[in-house]
């Protein structure tokens, strides 16, 4: 049984592509028809591709891998942040800083600087500093948090990227490809699907469509993690029983 239904996709407007004059011919195989100058995406193919992406997400999560959610366009910012947090992963939902992946050491230095400012605020250092200096530090903190807050606890490079609109996030795509990090992407009719390992052909401009698909990818991670918790809960009583029996013996 597919992880997402045609009805859900239709209700969220996933099938609406871009205007016919704004398209990438490589997306032809994912297009069902054209209506009033707009391409209509073949949702049967979307259902299948969501399944493939969902299963890959589960694989990554099963190996304790990390996934970086990326979506800096207005329609994606909230969903990308909320679903990454909900699934215990990382996100970039404002401007992608060049070198986020390919120059990870430098990015880490900026993150350490952000954490240093946070410690200064927490331990009372701000109270003994001149007001002007505190204002500047707070501005810097706000800026760093905006761009790096979603990855400040990410210890190393992610094992996969989930991207909303690879065309807009082309720098993130290029960096991931250079480092051979697999990409799952919500790909509209104006994108190049060849750059994406797991293509989800869909409307990347409708908030409801983006939210539905991003949440579904997060669900894959949560399912795996909840499964692990359940297994541990089931194993604990067995171990306790075995210990009791050994003690009695």
Swiss-Prot record:
Native organism: Listeria monocytogenes serovar 1/2a (strain ATCC BAA-679 / EGD-e)
Name the Gene Ontology biological process terms. Answer: translation
HAMAP family the UniProt entry points to: Ribosomal_uS2_B (MF_00291_B)
**Source taxonomy lineage?**
Bacteria, Bacillati, Bacillota, Bacilli, Bacillales
Q: Which Pfam families match?
A: Ribosomal_S2
The record's keywords, sorted A to Z, are: Ribonucleoprotein, Ribosomal protein
Q: Does the keyword Ribosomal protein apply?
A: yes
Per the record, the gene is rpsB
Q: Which GO terms describe its cellular component?
A: cytosolic small ribosomal subunit
The record's annotation in InterPro entries points to: Ribosomal_uS2, Ribosomal_uS2_bac/mit/plastid, Ribosomal_uS2_CS, Ribosomal_uS2_flav_dom_sf
Q: Which protein, by its recorded name, is this?
A: Small ribosomal subunit protein uS2
Q: Which family does it belong to?
A: Belongs to the universal ribosomal protein uS2 family.
Coiled-coil positions are: none
């Amino acid at each position: 049984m597919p992880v997402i239904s045609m009805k859900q996709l239709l209700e969220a407007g996933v099938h609406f592509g871009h205007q016919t004059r704004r398209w990438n011919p490589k997306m032809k195989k994912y297009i069902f028809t054209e209506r009033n100058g707009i391409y209509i995406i073949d949702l049967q193919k979307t259902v299948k591709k969501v399944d493939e992406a969902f299963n890959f997400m589960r694989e990554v999560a099963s190996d304790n891998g990390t996934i970086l959610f990326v979506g800096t366009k207005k329609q994606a910012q909230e969903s990308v942040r909320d679903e990454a947090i909900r699934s215990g992963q990382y996100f970039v939902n404002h401007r992608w800083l060049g070198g986020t992946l390919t120059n990870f050491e430098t990015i880490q230095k900026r993150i350490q600087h952000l954490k240093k400012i946070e410690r200064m605020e927490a331990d009372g250092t701000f109270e003994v500093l001149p007001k002007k200096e505190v204002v500047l530090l707070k501005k810097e903190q706000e800026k760093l948090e905006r761009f790096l807050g979603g990855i400040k606890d990410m210890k190393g490079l992610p094992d996969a990227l989930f991207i909303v609109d690879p065309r807009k996030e082309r720098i993130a795509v290029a960096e991931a490809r250079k480092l051979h990090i697999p990409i799952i992407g919500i790909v509209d009719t104006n994108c190049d699907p060849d750059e994406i390992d797991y293509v989800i052909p869909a409307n990347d401009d409708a908030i409801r469509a983006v939210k539905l698909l991003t949440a579904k990818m997060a669900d894959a991670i949560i399912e795996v993690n909840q499964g692990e918790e359940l297994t541990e809960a089931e194993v604990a009583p067995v171990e306790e029983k075995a210990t009791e029996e050994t003690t009695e013996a």
